[in-house]
Amino acid sequence: MEWSGEASVMALQRHGESAVILTVLSRETGLIRGLVPGGASAKRAAMLQPGNRVSLRWRARLEEQLGTFAVEPARARPGLLGSGDALAGVNAVTALLTFALPERDPHPRLADATEALLDLMDAGEGWAEAYLHWEMRLLDELGFGLDLTSCAVTGAREGLAYVSPRSGRAVSAQAAGEWAPRLLPLPAMLGGRGNGGIEDALALTGHFLQVRLAEAHAGKPLPPARARLVARLTASRHASGW
């Protein structure tokens, strides 16, 4: 069995004296792992940083085997290591993907969205909202998407203010009535009437990541890297006023 193409590094794990087990994300394969002989060397360390783009050839005798990678650099993203926020961002993205996705299950749209987000993080400008919409894409790709386009009760597209914590559907302020305290607020950033910032929008996606995604994985908690990113983005917003 053989596959070749480009992918972005998601994770690596030391294996033996000098090898690593590399996990990458590509449009064609989804997440795929392979052994990289000599991958633990200082020479290859920079190339195999999470978020970097690499050119790969994967080979295995049988499809179900781990296989080995021959790896060459394709495009580095040095900006991911250039700031604490960007580093926290790539750590959250790679941790969520390796937590959520089964191996060798292609999600081309999610892979494209991930590449675009990593490019924004590398450039270092205005990627917080893009990260929020990336989480929405992740939920959608895994079958847990939110429907924030119309009210679940009346069908109205105006005056949306809440989200049902169970169905993930929007609810208008008028339709919510006495149930409003039991619903989640829908921030303006996601088309609602709320005034909250990025932390409120991420609290909404975080609820569904935990309830739907984590519980689908035997109740395992979400990777701590996400909480660290949310804390940094919240602090940055309060410091800068965005």
Curated annotation (Swiss-Prot):
InterPro entries to which the protein is assigned, alphabetical: ARFGAP/RecO (IPR037278), DNA_rep/recomb_RecO_N (IPR022572), NA-bd_OB-fold (IPR012340), RecO (IPR003717), RecO_C (IPR042242)
Keyword DNA repair (UniProt): yes
Protein origin, superkingdom: Bacteria
Keyword DNA damage: yes
GO terms of biological process kind: DNA recombination; double-strand break repair
SUPFAM superfamilies, per the entry: ArfGap/RecO-like zinc finger (SSF57863), Nucleic acid-binding proteins (SSF50249)
Keywords tagged on the record: DNA damage, DNA recombination, DNA repair
GO (cellular component) term, any one: bacterial nucleoid
Family designation: Belongs to the RecO family.
Function: Involved in DNA repair and RecF pathway recombination.
NCBIfam families for the chain: reco
Name used for this protein in its record: DNA repair protein RecO
Gene: recO
